[in-house]
Amino acid sequence: NKIPYPRHKNFSIDDARELAKWRLPRLVFDIVDGASGNEFLSINNNKAYENIKLEPRVLINVEERSLKTKFLDTEYGLPFGFAPMGMCNLTWPNADTMLAKEAIDNNIPICSSMAASTSLEKIYELSNGLAWFQLYIGQDEDFVVDLLNRAQDCGYKTIILTVDVPILARRSRDNRNGFDIPFRMSIKNFIDFATHPN
């Protein structure tokens, strides 16, 4: 199942961002688009991407070319994969499932987030074994051991140890929108969701 949106309006990442801003409830858009604190790190990351320069190589034979990459003794179709993303299904029903299918179609890894909307077992099954598992340190030791056992039992071979969030960060947009876990629906959120039914 392909996502039914007007692809002809998406010519760039900025176009896709604007479409998401229009279609998604503000709370959901801000969860995806926002960052912690004053968002300077996110802004600086985007500036760093803008500074990447590609060097063209001309007058060489490009008849046989490939983006295949070998990493951790596995050959992948592209030199990148899907990063761990929590709560994907907030943005679109079964988004985790669609990402797993795309991973299979493109032979790329998908990293199952500890905050995924879909269980780590289901993501592994849906990805035909292309899934990696994200592990945050700092959780209760019994909880972490249980997660690792579950990941091992269903076949995960790669664990991505995530150390960038030693404590939960303050996210201003989420605070302004009243987003917290567990989520409690406010009148403002209800109206926002009702006016963005997609």
Model-derived segments and spans:
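An N-cap/entry alpha-helix motif that binds or orients negatively charged groups
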Residues: 1-72, 182-198
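Conserved, mostly hydrophobic/aromatic
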Residues: 25, 82, 103, 161
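A short, Lys/Arg-enriched amphipathic alpha-helix followed by its capping loop at the start of a domain
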Residues: 78-80, 99-108
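Hydrophobic faces of well-ordered beta-strands that scaffold small-molecule active sites
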Residues: 80-83, 110-112, 131-135, 159
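Active-site-adjacent beta->alpha loops and helix N-cap segments on the catalytic face
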Residues: 91-96, 112-130, 137-146, 166-179
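Phosphate/diphosphate-binding glycine-rich loops and adjacent basic-rich segments that engage nucleotide
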Residues: 157-198
